[in-house]
Amino acid sequence: MKKYIYIYFFFITITINDLVINNTSKCVSIERRKNNAYINYGIGYNGPDNKITKSRRCKRIKLCKKDLIDIGAIKKPINVAIFGSTGSIGTNALNIIRECNKIENVFNVKALYVNKSVNELYEQAREFLPEYLCIHDKSVYEELKELVKNIKDYKPIILCGDEGMKEICSSNSIDKIVIGIDSFQGLYSTMYAIMNNKIVALANKESIVSAGFFLKKLLNIHKNAKIIPVDSEHSAIFQCLDNNKVLKTKCLQDNFSKINNINKIFLCSSGGPFQNLTMDELKNVTSENALKHPKWKMGKKITIDSATMMNKGLEVIETHFLFDVDYNDIEVIVHKECIIHSCVEFIDKSVISQMYYPDMQIPILYSLTWPDRIKTNLKPLDLAQVSTLTFHKPSLEHFPCIKLAYQAGIKGNFYPTVLNASNEIANNLFLNNKIKYFDISSIISQVLESFNSQKVSENSEDLMKQILQIHSWAKDKATDIYNKHNSS
């Protein structure tokens, strides 16, 4: 089917060839035929079958691809950097990019950044041929350079460490950056991406939990930077909103919920692998049990957090910061089928939800294409096959980490920073079977009780230092609590 662009009084409308236009109207049209495109201009009118015909006064000029990109007839591919490309988020991002590019060339992978997985990075480089490769661990930097020599006619810019990450963030050839680095380490790359006015597809909830007010300050300074949530629940909330309203503001800004008419958020959770266990059974679970998530395939840290439901607690704080929603208006709901990922109740009390199978490719894709959507070949949702959707409230007795997260969030100040840091230590101790299930919440609770509120620095640089110091203090305190308990 031929496609045209009509320009009336300097306004552009994209349409197809059977649109009725007024007889003898002055118009300019772009006609696409196979691999060629032409611009027609002059006096156009409808034929008897309502198809566009051209009078003798029309002229035609052949266009090149660059002309079409410049006027918007063909969209320029989105240039993407993926930080943590060998992790769960990174590999999912590359999977959906690969599949979408089979339909239409939508994405260019411009940069890949990993911690130390040199062989996996090499394989990704062979396929996607990015302009930049960066490895954080300097000890394998030379190995990466030698491996890349095996790729014929490929000469990327090979970087390492934080300096390499900063160079990628500052590149003018990159439009969007996927932050798939977990834990507090992801904050650095998020910060530098914002400082370079990038659109950040953020999967690192710890950045927002630990430094939400710092990121808000940065986003106010760097006006063109945006954070688009990748977490399935927060992507679901974001997808439920009216883009016309979203475009008037951005995530992590005051009055976001007011502008978007948000009244309440229902934050959905699978419940994790321990949802049906008794208190006595929970006392004896191991990390091996926790890593068997019933629905999602994720990294170890987030899978443990899902089992304790601390992941949902962190997401409550993330929801508060991202969408400017009061903690009393965020409700956690266990939805074991994982079809509805979250719901938004608006001020008129209507509720909109986003639904799909538990698959991170959808939220990752939306974070890259927003405010648009593109065609995919993903499996369509079959509601008849799903059949039943269930919901219930989680037990705070069985999952005390949720309660701790609400308490830390409501206290504000640096309590979410302390919560996140102490959880990193407790999570790792449980992962290595050094503590029991309920010891996780016990350690976190003791660290929170030991912390005293501090005055928040006004200067952005000083505030970042303050967050780092408190994060380090909380990790040390959690480790100290474990060591004292272990030695007694």
UniProtKB/Swiss-Prot annotation:
Mg(2+) binds at residues 231, 233, 315. GO terms for molecular function: 1-deoxy-D-xylulose-5-phosphate reductoisomerase activity; manganese ion binding; NADPH binding. It holds the Pfam family DXP_reductoisom. InterPro entries: DXP_reductoisomerase, DXP_reductoisomerase_C, DXP_reductoisomerase_N, DXPR_C, DXPR_C_sf, NAD(P)-bd_dom_sf. Residues 1-72 form a transit peptide. HAMAP family: DXP_reductoisom. Belongs to the DXR family. This is 1-deoxy-D-xylulose 5-phosphate reductoisomerase, apicoplastic. It comes from Plasmodium falciparum (isolate HB3). The gene is DXR.
